[in-house]
Design a protein with these regions (language model features):
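Short, solvent-exposed coil/turn elements at secondary-structure transition points
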Residues: 10, 33-35, 82
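Thiol-based oxidoreductase modules, predominantly thioredoxin-like and allied folds used
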Residues: 25-38
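Non-catalytic, surface beta->alpha helical segment in thiol-disulfide oxidoreductase systems
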Residues: 56-83
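Local sequence-structure signature of Cys/Sec-based thiol-disulfide redox active-site neighborhoods
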Residues: 1-26
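Bateman/CBS regulatory modules and CBS-like beta-alpha motifs in cytosolic regions of diverse proteins
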Residues: 26-28, 82-85
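Structural micro-motif
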Residues: 46-55, 65
Length: 86
């Protein structure tokens, strides 16, 4: 399961979602424009308030740059294996 915390106007959120869509994986988007949802996200990611925040199979992988780094180093497909059927 992939969870991505986003806001509607965040370009990094859009880039992260674009990469996940290109990988043909399903994800749950949690929009944190509401202060209560953002506080819940922040508590889950050790106080971070920036978006996106991405979880793959319950593991926090970081933000957009972290997701693209996983892709560049060839590690993203392995993390997504459960979701892609690889």
């Amino acid at each position: 399961m992939i969870e991505i915390y986003t806001t509607p106007t965040c370009p990094f959120c859009h880039a992260a979602k674009d990469l996940l869509r290109a990988k043909s994986v399903l994800f749950e988007e949690i929009v944190v424009a509401d202060p209560d949802k953002r506080a819940a996200m922040s508590a889950r990611v050790d106080g971070r308030t920036s978006v996106p925040q991405i979880f793959i199979n319950g593991t926090h992988v970081g933000g957009c740059d972290d997701l693209y780094m996983l892709e560049e180093t060839g590690k993203l497909n392995a993390l997504l294996a459960i979701n892609t059927g690889d």
